[in-house]
């Protein structure tokens, strides 16, 4: 698991240059994960965000932030590997993502405290 929290931080500040640098770092991590998954076919890669921040839009060839806060915009979910087909062409709620990952580990009662304890051991 990897989180590039600086994307969110810099979007709150409407700082496009720093956001871009954070996205480049995130893309490098994604490339490493995808290469690993390519050579290890039982690997599942999931790329998403827990929310959108800043309302970044492109207007007349210029990128413009519309907010310094989280928005209600949907965020994409990209999946690769075993089980990726579960995320093809659908809209999911955030809670469905960890539930699906837990089910890959044989845990059907995600959210139950005992399940959480067994996953973090």
Annotate each language-model stretch with its function.
Residues 1-121:
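Feature captures the catalytic ectodomains and active-site-proximal regions of enzymes
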């Amino acid at each position: 698991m990897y989180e590039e929290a600086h994307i969110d931080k810099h979007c709150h500040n409407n700082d496009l240059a720093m956001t871009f640098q954070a996205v480049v770092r995130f893309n490098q991590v994604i490339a490493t994960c995808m290469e690993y998954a390519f050579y290890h076919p039982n690997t599942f890669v999931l790329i998403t965000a827990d929310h959108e921040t800043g309302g970044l839009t492109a207007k007349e060839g210029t990128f413009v932030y519309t907010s310094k806060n989280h928005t209600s915009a949907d965020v994409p979910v990209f999946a690769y590997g075993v089980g990726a087909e579960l995320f093809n062409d659908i809209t999911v709620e955030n809670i469905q993502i960890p539930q699906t990952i837990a089910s890959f580990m044989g845990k059907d009662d995600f959210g139950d405290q005992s399940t959480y304890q067994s996953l973090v051991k």
